[in-house]
A protein has these predicted regions:
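Structural and coupling elements of P-loop NTPases
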Residues: 1-543
Length: 543
């Protein structure tokens, strides 16, 4: 590779910022996503979730069931440019039932933006998602939303977030008042106050009104006691909080905090600026064979998500791939490491929610979509020839089970085809019992079953009966001795099923049954997690 090409590749990688937005449901995550697109110039008008009964819907909530219920259940991917940076934004499912899909999305990003509802503080889903980020040392920015409502006192929020999340907080902005007395925010880094005024769908010309100097006497005159209170709180916080430390932030131990109101376009530009200035460009990615650097000349990437029916008119499946290294070019020869098959993708797309545009090139950090007809699976690595297997893309053992039958026997083929596609997405797990014909669905929450039934009917024309199944525990099984594994399967055929990649799974009613089985079959390993393609994490959970 010539030095000019190397310089260009390094420059393109430096420009990339790939991050996910995480929050508890209803914290305003989808609204903030919209407004980030608005401020970057990617869209001209925001389609408010609140207006979903009218003709507009949130740009990132594209699936029919999401529009009806106002929740994000599939992760959307959007690309935009801002301040000479290419930003890849992943909007994750806000509903807790879809935490598995969210986990996989978080393996594809270099930073996370955590949205907290100022009225509710830290909520359960936020905690769970943050644990995932902390386990991966993902840098996190915090946006405290909905300051235009009656909310918790800022100091209480500060203490709660620091205590609950176990991270040190560095306030970049601090609110003046709340609810109907919300006057704006004190920008602690720029020594100015940004004045709040309710916004609409469009970005205000000229931006927010700014008053220079945090000690400016005009602020006390204009905003009275809310300003005086905020100024004294800032003094306290500055004494208690550490200064911003880039190394601590990049290690996921310190989070900058900004306040605002996404629905009113307030505080959004500051979030966008902080993401561009602070979030890291793509870093090295771990594979079983070696560590892959983003500036390596050869292309490689990993499939972290598969989505069926993004365009119902075409019954399509799109494999979402995070570029790990090199430069992608349309039509280049790529190898699927798992199967050895060659691909030459010509219709590769980039995304604006469900809108797609053909792309000619992509670099490390970019998310590209490859139309897929069963060739690609979750976790697959594509490369220019090297056999790489990127690690860290898990499946979790389901905690709820349903049997599924078709109401019309003539639609059995469509049912299996639909479940195969939906299973490939990883939003539901499909099991085929070794002894028996009734398919089983496994999920981590009830909503997943509702979504599958809805999508089978509306996308595949199959009315399915989803009924309770007697199972409550699932474990993937492996054994170093192939004959012993087969003996186990034969001896427990009524309790063993095969998943989407034919990985044998034992399905049980009670945790006690699992303990007894572990005692009776000491050579068999039971796993609550597995990597894609049947490769199981070497992690045994007790019970």
């Amino acid at each position: 590779m010539s030095s000019d090409t190397e310089i260009r590749l390094a420059g393109e990688v430096r420009r990339r910022r790939t991050f996910a937005i995480i929050s508890h449901p209803d914290a305003g995550k989808t609204t903030l996503t919209e407004k980030l697109l608005l401020f970057s110039g990617a869209i001209q008008i925001a389609g408010s979730v609140k207006a979903r009964k009218a003709t507009r819907h949130a740009t990132s909530d594209w699936m029919e069931i999401e529009k009806q219920r106002g929740i994000s259940v599939a992760s959307s991917v959007m690309q935009m440019e801002y301040r000479d940076c290419v930003i890849n934004l992943l909007d994750t499912p806000g509903h807790q039932d879809f935490s598995e899909d969210t986990y996989r999305v978080l393996t594809a990003v270099d930073a996370a933006l955590m949205v907290i509802d100022a009225a509710n503080g830290v909520e359960p889903q936020t905690r769970r998602l943050l644990q995932v980020c902390r386990a991966r040392n993902t840098p996190i920015l915090t946006f405290v939303n909905k300051m235009d409502r009656e909310v918790k006192a800022p100091l209480d929020l500060f203490d709660e977030i620091e205590r609950e999340l176990g991270m040190s907080i560095v306030p970049f902005t601090w609110p003046v008042g709340m609810g109907k007395f919300f006057g704006g925010v004190l920008d602690l880094r720029r020594d100015q106050m940004r004045v709040f005024s309710p916004g609409e769908d469009r970005v205000k010309e000229g931006g927010d009104e700014v008053v220079e100097g945090l000690q400016n006497p005009a602020l006390a005159e204009r905003f009275g006691s809310p300003y005086m209170e905020a100024a004294s709180e800032v003094e306290l916080v500055r004494e208690a909080a550490p200064g911003f430390d880039e190394a601590e932030f990049l290690a996921g131990r310190q989070t900058p905090m900004l306040f605002g109101s996404a629905i009113n376009n307030f505080g959004v530009q500051e979030v966008l600026d902080a993401l561009v200035e602070l979030a890291p460009p793509p870093g090295a990615k771990a594979a079983l064979q070696r560590e892959v650097q983003p500036v390596e000349p050869k292309f490689s990437g990993v499939v972290f998500k598969i989505q069926a029916n993004m365009d119902p008119a075409h019954r399509d499946r799109i494999a979402f791939l995070r570029v790990a290294s090199g430069r992608f070019e349309r039509g280049m020869r790529l190898k699927v490491a798992r199967s050895g098959k060659e691909l030459r993708p010509n219709t590769v797309v980039t995304f604006m929610s469900q809108r797609r545009e053909l792309l000619d090139e992509a670099y490390a950090g970019d998310i590209i979509g490859i139309p897929n007809h069963g060739v690609l699976q979750l976790g697959d690595t594509l490369s220019e020839g090297e056999s790489l297997q990127f690690t860290g893309l898990p499946f979790f053992a389901p905690e709820m089970f349903r049997s599924v039958e078709v109401a019309d026997p003539l639609k059995t083929k469509q049912l299996r085809a639909g479940l195969t596609q939906l299973g490939e997405e990883g939003a539901i797990q499909v099991f085929r019992p070794v002894a028996g014909t009734v398919l089983l669905l496994g999920a981590v929450g009830q909503l997943q079953f509702e979504v599958v039934a809805h999508r089978l009917e509306h996308e595949y024309g199959v009315k399915a009966r989803v009924m309770p199944a007697r199972y409550n525990v699932a474990r993937w099984v492996t054994c170093d001795d192939a004959k012993e594994l087969q003996r186990f399967i034969d001896g427990n055929a009524h309790r063993v099923a095969l998943d989407a990649v034919d990985a044998p799974t034992v399905l049980l009613e009670y945790a006690g049954e699992l303990r007894a089985m572990q005692d009776n079959w000491p050579k068999i390993q039971f796993h609550a997690l597995r990597e894609h393609a049947g490769l199981v994490f070497q992690k045994q959970l007790q019970g």
